[in-house]
Amino acid sequence: MYDPMATAMNLVPMVVEQTSRGERAFDIFSRLLKERIIFLTGPVEDGMASLICAQLLFLESENPKKEIAMYINSPGGVVTAGLAIYDTMQYIKSPVSTVCMGMAASMGSLLLQAGAPGHRIALPNARIMVHQPSGGFRGQASDIERHAEDIIKTKRRLNEIYVKHTGRTYEEVEKTLDRDHFMSAEEAKAWGLIDHINESRDEADEKA
């Protein structure tokens, strides 16, 4: 089956740098990692979460006081994988700024609003979508009941995280997340998911 994400990753360009020891070649994402820039793109799943968490922990070990920039373009994905990234963002000492380019939906929106206060950014044409968790399970009635109880607990926990970072009341969050709720960058700012909408690098530097 054709996988556009895999195809794109196979076309990642290389960057050649001159050093005192000669030339060194980096893929573009590794080169940006040297500048403390992380890309969270595509569906949020366990493999991606491991890579993102490892990058966050590595950059913290390099300089715990220096900011890390996380660029997000994601349709969301697995809740547990997203919460692993969220917890690591909160756990490390380095402040993490978040930038939405394209789309931050579902778990992507939760990670966007989890950036350091004052450093949550969207580009002008970014779209943000929030909603409650979804899932499915087949099995014995008692097992289905337990899974239903667990997803309700998960829903409550995710709502509490949105409350913490947006300043909205629990009731407001629960009502907004009841169905797929799409927002423009301006609407996301008004709702408290982001702090700034930046059209240019100069504008971002002025607000830094």
UniProtKB/Swiss-Prot annotation:
Organism: Caulobacter sp. (strain K31)
Keyword Hydrolase: yes
Protein name: ATP-dependent Clp protease proteolytic subunit
PANTHER family: ATP-DEPENDENT CLP PROTEASE PROTEOLYTIC SUBUNIT
Family: Belongs to the peptidase S14 family.
Localization per Swiss-Prot or TrEMBL: Cytoplasm
Catalytic reactions on record: Hydrolysis of proteins to small peptides in the presence of ATP and magnesium. alpha-casein is the usual test substrate. In the absence of ATP, only oligopeptides shorter than five residues are hydrolyzed (such as succinyl-Leu-Tyr-|-NHMec, and Leu-Tyr-Leu-|-Tyr-Trp, in which cleavage of the -Tyr-|-Leu- and -Tyr-|-Trp bonds also occurs)
Alphabetized SUPFAM superfamilies for the sequence: ClpP/crotonase
Molecular-function GO terms, alphabetical: ATP-dependent peptidase activity; ATPase binding; serine-type endopeptidase activity
Main location per the UniProt record: cytoplasm
GO biological process, one term: protein quality control for misfolded or incompletely synthesized proteins
Lineage, broadest ranks: Bacteria, Pseudomonadati, Pseudomonadota, Alphaproteobacteria, Caulobacterales
Assembly and interaction partners: Fourteen ClpP subunits assemble into 2 heptameric rings which stack back to back to give a disk-like structure with a central cavity, resembling the structure of eukaryotic proteasomes.
Keywords from the named record: Cytoplasm, Hydrolase, Protease, Serine protease
